[in-house]
C-alpha cells in the first residue's frame, strides 16, 4: 500500500515512511522512563491517552509534554482521545503532537477552524461499518482497527479487516496483540503497522515492561 502524502493541509504535508517494515506503535505511555524504552527499541509511534479519566493510562497534557520531551525526534507523538471537544483538540494541537487518534466522534468544525493535525480514526469491531463514513474524509490520515474494548488485551476476528477496502491511508491493527501472536497477526492482515498497549505492560498492569517491548519489536523484525 502506498501511504505517501496521506494528509495535506495548507501549512504542511505529512508523509508516512513507505518501506517494507511494519510500523510499531506503543500506546498508553505514562512516564518519561517508558519513552526511553521506545527509544531503545526504535519504534515509530508513541501513544498517550488524554482527557479520558476512565482509563488507567490517562495522563494530563503536562505529563504528556514531559514524555514527548524524552522521546527521540524520529518517534511520532500520538494523542489518543475519545469523542474530544474542539477545545481539547486545540490543546493537543498546541502541545506538539504529530497525530490525534480519535475513538468515537470527531468534533465538527467550520472549514476555517479545521483540525490542524492528521487524524487516526479508531474503530472497534462493533462500529467497523462506520468506516465508510470516513473513507473519503480528507482529514483522516489512517485507521486503527481494535477490539470491542480498546486497551483490554482482547483480540478480535482479524478476518473482519478483510472487508475494509485498502486505500492510500495508513492501517494499524490493534487489539490483544503481544509478542507471541503479533507475527501471526501481521501475516493474516498485512497491516501497515501494529498498535499495542496492555500486551507490553507489567504483569500487574502498572506501567510498560521494557523486556516485553523488546520481545514485541524483536518478533516483528525477526
Labelled PLM ranges:
Residues 1-222:
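Conserved N-terminal beta1-alpha1 strand-loop-helix module at the mouth
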Amino acid at each position: 500500500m502506498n501511504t505517501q502524502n496521506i494528509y495535506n493541509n495548507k501549512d504542511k504535508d505529512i508523509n508516512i515512511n513507505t518501506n517494507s517494515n511494519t510500523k510499531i506503535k506503543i500506546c498508553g505511555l505514562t512516564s518519561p522512563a517508558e519513552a526511553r524504552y521506545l527509544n531503545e527499541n526504535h519504534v515509530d509511534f508513541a501513544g498517550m491517552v488524554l482527557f479520558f479519566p476512565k482509563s488507567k493510562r490517562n495522563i494530563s497534557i503536562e505529563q504528556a509534554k514531559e514524555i514527548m520531551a524524552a522521546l527521540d525526534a524520529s518517534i511520532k507523538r500520538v494523542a489518543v482521545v475519545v469523542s474530544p471537544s474542539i477545545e481539547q483538540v486545540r490543546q493537543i494541537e498546541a502541545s506538539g503532537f504529530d497525530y490525534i487518534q480519535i475513538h468515537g466522534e470527531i468534533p465538527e468544525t467550520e472549514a476555517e477552524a479545521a483540525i490542524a493535525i492528521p487524524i487516526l480514526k479508531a474503530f472497534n469491531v462493533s462500529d467497523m461499518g462506520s468506516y465508510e463514513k470516513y473513507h473519503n474524509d480528507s482529514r483522516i490520515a489512517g485507521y486503527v482497527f481494535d477490539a470491542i474494548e480498546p486497551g483490554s488485551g482482547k483480540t478480535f476476528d482479524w478476518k473482519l479487516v478483510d472487508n475494509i477496502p485498502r486505500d492510500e491511508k495508513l492501517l494499524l491493527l490493534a487489539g490483544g496483540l503481544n509478542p507471541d501472536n503479533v507475527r501471526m497477526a501481521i501475516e493474516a492482515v498485512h497491516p501497515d503497522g501494529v498498535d499495542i498497549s496492555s500486551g507490553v505492560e507489567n504483569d500487574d498492569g502498572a506501567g510498560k515492561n521494557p523486556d516485553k517491548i523488546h520481545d514485541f519489536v524483536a518478533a516483528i523484525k525477526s
